[in-house]
């Protein structure tokens, strides 16, 4: 009896953790990790090189630019 109750409680906890993360938010994170814009600092992902974000796209920095404007 205790094993059944424990199994039900564990199943409920796992389901609540899965339901807490919306599918659209997880998809957005995977797109950002592939080189999209990082809104907190306006730079693109480090893997995409020295680029700034312009809207939702990454643009190349010139040799003289060291920060992202705007």
Swiss-Prot record:
One of its GO terms (cellular component) is extracellular region. It is found in: Secreted. Pfam families: Toxin_7 (PF05980). Expressed by the venom gland. One of its GO terms (molecular function) is toxin activity. Residues 21-34 form a propeptide. Residues 1-20 form the signal peptide. The modification Leucine amide is found at residue 69. Disulfide bonds join 37-53, 44-58, 52-68. The presence of a 'disulfide through disulfide knot' structurally defines this protein as a knottin. Insect active toxin causing rapid but reversible paralysis in crickets. No activity shown in mammals. Does not show effect on mammalian voltage-gated calcium channels. This is U2-agatoxin-Ao1p. It comes from Agelena orientalis. The lineage of its organism: Eukaryota, Metazoa, Ecdysozoa, Arthropoda, Chelicerata.
């Amino acid at each position: 009896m205790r094993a059944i109750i424990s199994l039900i409680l564990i199943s409920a906890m796992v389901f609540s953790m899965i339901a807490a993360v919306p599918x659209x938010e997880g998809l957005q994170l995977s797109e950002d990790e592939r080189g999209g814009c990082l809104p907190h600092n306006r730079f693109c992902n480090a893997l995409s090189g020295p680029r700034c974000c312009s809207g939702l796209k990454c643009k190349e920095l010139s040799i003289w630019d060291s920060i992202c404007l705007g």
